[in-house]
Amino acid sequence: VAESGKKSHGGISLAPRTIVPIKVEYGARVSDEFIYASDEERINILKAFNDGFAKKLARGLDLMAFHGVNPRSGTASAVIGDNNFDAAVDQVVEAPAGLEDANGVIESAIALVDGGDVTGMAIAPQFRSALAGQTRTDGTPLFPELAWGNAPDTINGLPVDVNKTVADMSEDARAYVGDFQGGFKWGYAKQIPLEVIQYGDPDNSGLDLKGYNQVYLRAEAYLGWGVLAPEAFARVVEGIVEGA
């Protein structure tokens, strides 16, 4: 920069990314006494319902973003397509079955990350167990903070999330590491108010609500996410034992 100097291109490059929001639904049948219950009792029921919705929504987002599956069926979703880590991230470290050198595997995965900071890691419970079993040359645990099933928020200063969704609905996924702060984004496009349905068979269970003295509570939301920088991540998969 110089006084009266000519302005030049700053080097930033912008490319549009299209993120298509996906509608997700959560519902539960409850007794039709919900309609006539006191305000206090209805609030208690709705609190429990909302807690369930929040947990299912978080789990569903993980499964869709990690593996590109329909959380309800476990099958690949054509709507999600390649907008998931398993399809978008090409940097892969295959660990031998048994995950004997889990620490070395993570070091190899981090070495593959290109163009981004390593800001976090998501690991499956079995990978956490493998890390807990790592020892130093003198036999002491390499990660004593993982003893007895403990799942700390950080390991070696790196934020870590131990989550079953890393391996659920996937044959070999065990860990994801990379720039979760800058390379992946998600959010709500729209949240639809809670609906209380008193008639019909809204969950296609074959059981009429009136016939079973029930009402159906339904909550829906539109979620969107994107793996903005696939090169800023690496995946760890576990080799499959032949004949197992």
Regions found by a protein language model. Name each.
Residues V30-D32, P125, A219:
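Residues immediately flanking
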Residues E25, R29-L112, R235-V236, I240-A244:
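Alpha-helical scaffold segments that mediate packing/assembly in large oligomeric complexes
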Residues V1-G27, D51, A232:
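Assembly/oligomerization interface modules of large self-assembling protein complexes
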Residues V1, E40, A132-R136, S170-R174, ...:
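Short conserved micro-motifs at the rims of enzyme active sites and ligand-binding pockets
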Residues S205-A244:
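Protruding loop/beta-arch "assembly-hinge" segments enriched in small, turn-prone residues
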Residues P16, E41-I45, S205:
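Conserved aromatic-histidine-acidic binding/catalytic patches
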Residues D86-A87, Q91-D208, N213-V215:
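Extended oligomerization regions of viral-like shell subunits
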Residues E25, F34, R59, F127-S129, ...:
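Short loop/turn segments at secondary-structure transitions that flank enzyme active sites
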